[in-house]
């Protein structure tokens, strides 16, 4: 599209001055930003349009000036300087001067180093011959000088027993040298001559050893490799000797518990410590196959523990089952909706009557007199035979009523087949169908046990007495099977425990 300058060139018109209003294009006015913040597009705009006038009180959109990260905090406090200051550790004896960074102002070199207080040393009193004899520290294999050497190493290395055992270089010849140190100082010239003679003798011995055969060399090497009596000390020997000396000193607090002495009465279990180390060595010397076998045994033991707890629970349930009273009647008839409805109706009837129901078929004490049924002749023409007949009929009726009103015994009821029921279920049913049944797994075992005895799975003649006996036999069989299962579990566990005990 042609501009105004192009049109003026075509028409040969002069150009406008720069201050002319026609050349000045109007500036676009900036629209005010919406109150809600940035204008939303797409799905957000549609969602806000659905809201209508219910605009949120707080803007959901993010302003452009907000950032995802927190602003840098404006600390108003002044920065604390760090000074490179020399210092001297009072725990050192060589007077070495080091430097370190210290927060704060300048520190003088005379200030105490804060970590020097942590340099604590263990000190023990010097043993003399009187102390050694008074405390009764003389034991076979230990001397006074060797005990002093041990206490010196303990105080120097702060009871770090691996370091003490590594630095232990005591030899039996040192006792003689320490005991005769004073005499050697007086007779210095003689000792020097003797030492020179010893050196010459040792050189001759070395030359002789070099000329020996290989077999003699091996023997000599073995002898040299064997440590002397003083160097054959183990860590347990050193610990035992140290704690015996300390416990003997602690029995005299007036002399050996001054400041600077750390005396503690400790009884060192030497045998237990040796066994513990041997056990750890055996653990570390295990092969991967042995480790896998131990893990498998641990899993088996955990399974046995779980099975033992489960068996205890089952045993408690079985004991409850054995101690529980046996039900006299079956509840199978009340397991259907029809039976429950019938039970509720009977209970409602009993509550309405307000008295106990009488047994069906029973006759009250006031039995009807059958004598009234016999017609009495009022005629005067009755003969004597008719009168006798009426008397006999009356006697028979009274005897029948007395027999009916009489309460029969259990034997008589069983003989005559008389039974009493609180409520008879409606409809016709087979008595054998009312026999209680168990779970399928238990029922099959009960049937198999009955067949072994020679009893069929269902009674052939299901009378009331036979059905009751059959139910009692089934219940006894179920209890017997549960006890047998529990006994088998106990036997297997006893067998496993005996096997584990034999392995140990």
From Swiss-Prot:
GO BP field: chromatin remodeling; DNA repair; negative regulation of transcription by RNA polymerase II
One Pfam family linked to the record: SANT_DAMP1_like
Compositional bias annotation for Basic and acidic residues: 1-11, 184-226, 372-391
CC terms in the record's Gene Ontology section: NuA4 histone acetyltransferase complex; Swr1 complex
GO molecular function, one term: transcription corepressor activity
InterPro entries attached to this UniProt entry: DAMP1_SANT-like, DMAP1, Swc4/Dmap1
Cellular localization per UniProt: Nucleus
Entry keyword set: Activator, Chromatin regulator, DNA damage, DNA repair, Nucleus, Transcription, Transcription regulation
Region (Disordered): 1-36, 181-235, 346-391
UniProt record similarity statement: Belongs to the SWC4 family.
Oligomer and partners: Component of the SWR1 chromatin-remodeling complex and of the NuA4 histone acetyltransferase complex.
Function noted in UniProt: Component of the SWR1 complex which mediates the ATP-dependent exchange of histone H2A for the H2A variant HZT1 leading to transcriptional regulation of selected genes by chromatin remodeling. Component of the NuA4 histone acetyltransferase complex which is involved in transcriptional activation of selected genes principally by acetylation of nucleosomal histone H4 and H2A. The NuA4 complex is also involved in DNA repair.
Protein name: SWR1-complex protein 4
Species name: Yarrowia lipolytica (strain CLIB 122 / E 150) (Yeast)
């Amino acid at each position: 599209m042609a501009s105004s300058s192009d049109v003026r060139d075509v028409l040969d018109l002069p150009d406008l001055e720069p201050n002319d209003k026609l050349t000045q294009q109007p500036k676009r006015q900036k629209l005010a930003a919406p109150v809600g913040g940035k204008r939303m597009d797409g799905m957000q705009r549609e969602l806000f349009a659905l809201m209508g006038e219910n605009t949120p009180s707080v803007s959901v959109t993010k302003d452009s000036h907000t950032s995802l990260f927190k602003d840098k905090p404006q600390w108003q406090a002044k920065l604390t300087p760090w000074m490179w200051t020399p210092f001297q550790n009072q725990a050192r004896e060589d007077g070495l001067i080091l430097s370190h960074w210290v927060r704060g102002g300048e520190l003088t070199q005379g200030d105490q180093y804060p970590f020097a207080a942590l340099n604590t040393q263990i000190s023990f009193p010097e043993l003399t011959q009187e102390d050694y004899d008074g405390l009764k520290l003389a034991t076979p294999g230990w001397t006074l000088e060797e005990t002093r050497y041990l206490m010196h190493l303990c105080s120097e290395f702060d009871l770090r027993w691996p370091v003490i055992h590594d630095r232990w270089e005591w030899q039996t010849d040192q006792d003689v040298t320490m005991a005769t140190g004073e005499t050697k100082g007086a007779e210095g010239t003689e000792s020097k001559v003797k030492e020179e003679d010893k050196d010459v003798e040792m050189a001759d011995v070395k030359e002789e050893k070099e000329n020996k055969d290989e077999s003699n060399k091996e023997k000599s090497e073995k002898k040299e490799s064997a440590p002397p009596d003083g160097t054959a000390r183990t860590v347990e020997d050193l610990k035992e000797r140290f704690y015996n000396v300390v416990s003997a000193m602690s029995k005299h607090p007036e002399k050996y518990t001054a400041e600077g002495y750390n005396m503690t009465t400790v009884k060192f279990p030497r045998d237990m410590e040796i066994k513990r180390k041997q056990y750890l060595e055996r653990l570390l010397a295990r092969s991967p196959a042995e480790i896998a076998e131990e893990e498998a045994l641990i899993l088996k033991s955990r399974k046995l523990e779980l099975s033992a707890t489960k068996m205890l629970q089952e045993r408690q349930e079985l004991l409850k089952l054995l101690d529980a009273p046996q039900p006299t009647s079956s509840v199978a008839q009340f397991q259907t909706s029809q039976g429950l409805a019938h039970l509720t109706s009977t209970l409602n009837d009993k509550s309405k009557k307000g008295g106990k129901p009488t047994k069906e078929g029973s006759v009250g004490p006031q039995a009807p007199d059958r004598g009234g049924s016999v017609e009495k002749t009022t005629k005067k023409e009755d003969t004597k035979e008719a009168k006798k007949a009426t008397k006999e009929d009356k006697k028979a009726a009274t005897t029948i009523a007395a027999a009916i009103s009489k309460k029969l015994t259990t034997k008589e009821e069983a003989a005559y087949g008389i039974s009493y029921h609180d409520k008879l279920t409606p409809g016709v049913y087979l008595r054998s169908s009312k026999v209680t049944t168990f779970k399928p797994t238990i029922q099959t075992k009960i049937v198999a046990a009955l067949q072994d005895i020679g009893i069929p799975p269902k009674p052939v003649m299901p009378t009331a007495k036979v059905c009751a006996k059959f139910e009692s036999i089934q219940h006894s069989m179920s209890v017997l099977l549960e006890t047998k299962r529990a006994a088998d579990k106990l036997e297997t566990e006893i067998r496993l425990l005996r096997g584990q005990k034999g392995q140990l």
